[in-house]
Amino acid sequence: MDPESFSAAFFKWDQRPPALAPPQMQRSAGLEAQRIFHDFGVPNAAAMAASNNSSSCRKELNCLEELFRNYGVRYITLTKMVDMGFTVNTLVNMTEQELDDLVRTLVEIYRVELLVGEKYGIKSAIRAEKRRLEEAERKRMEQLFVDVDGKRKIDENALDTLSQEGLSVEEPQGDNAIILSQNNTSANFPLNLNAGMDPVLILQNSGHLGTTVSGLIGMPDTNYGSEQTKACKKQKRRRSKDSGEDGEERQREHPFIVTEPGELARGKKNGLDYLFDLYEQCGKFLLDVQHIAKERGEKCPTKVTNQVFRHAKHSGAGYINKPKMRHYVHCYALHCLDIEQSNRLRRAYKERGENVGAWRQACYYPLVAMAKDNGWDIEGVFNKHEKLRIWYVPTKLRQLCHLEKSKQSHL
């Protein structure tokens, strides 16, 4: 039989419907069709995997060609390295010893006849790629530091502007420590505040020195180190727990300097007139809170509480906060009760160049004397004054009055 006629007859399309076969024949024919469909209709998974693997190898080979382009490494050597599973990333991360082992493996195990120039070309290309990556990383870190330093300078300029406009910004550090000097105060006032009352807290500035960032190829860091930041935060929490002033008061220097009445402060720090004005603003915010509470039918606060500080912050006066206002409330009390004595104290400490911490401690003495004249009722002294009755009496002031009263009773 002619093969061509046989093929044409075999593949001729028959338009007539096929006759019904017996059930057993139909089942066998169905199984045969499924087998044929499975063998010829579905793509082979192994072929697809081989195709993907070939594409991946081709991609890695192109990367190796780009790496060793100008270093005299032959194409057959690159192909063998791809077969061994090496990529550009693995080669760059290898040490010199590992590169020697790679060359030795190519020669001894895979029987690749490397030229003398190829051995040095492989190492030279990898060293050059390492230097290129390190240089790119160094430039990226320099740009990052420049951006951070520029942002820091912008923030400092903004803080300077806000400070000159009358906004007080919290700063946890101070140029001096909070130390009560008995030599400077005992000549004017007989009371000793450090007689077993509070430990002397010294705020060290060494926690804000610039450090270097480890792991960043030895680049110096202009920001504070993470270790110093953690230590500073721990020191703040410790001072907050050890504070004898109030339950939530933290002993730290605020951005104020001792100024005479009517004197304007220069630089970032504000004067004492500005500090006393903050207490006047708190009184106005208390009136606002009382007015709102009356409109809502709620209980009106009679003293400056957390609700007043939250209202001040919501109104845009974020520079008014509880720690600062509680820290200097007795100074404001002396200013309200005896402004002449307060002004004399300010002038004296300004002439001596004392910091605001020492001036703050000295403000306790006249208040203790006033409490003595009032039968040691410091609460009554505050309640008699219209501007002071809205403030809580500091715990430290109560303790000093009790201590002085005990000394007087033993005499």
Curated annotation (Swiss-Prot):
Instruction: Reply yes or no: does the keyword Nucleus apply.
Output: yes
Main subcellular localisation: nucleus
Location in the cell: Nucleus
Keywords, comma-separated and alphabetical: Activator, Developmental protein, DNA-binding, Nucleus, Transcription, Transcription regulation
Instruction: List every stretch annotated Disordered.
Output: 220-259
Superkingdom of the source species: Eukaryota
GO molecular-function annotation terms? DNA binding
- Compositionally biased tracts (Basic and acidic residues): 241-255
Q: Where is the composition biased (Basic residues)?
A: 231-240
| One of the protein's GO biological processes | regulation of DNA-templated transcription
What Pfam families does the database record attribute to this sequence?
A: C_LFY_FLO (PF17538), SAM_LFY (PF01698)
State the family named in the UniProt similarity comment for this chain.
Answer: Belongs to the FLO/LFY family.
**Name this polypeptide is given:** Floricaula/leafy-like protein
Lineage of the organism: Eukaryota, Viridiplantae, Streptophyta, Embryophyta, Tracheophyta
Quick one: which gene encodes this? FLL
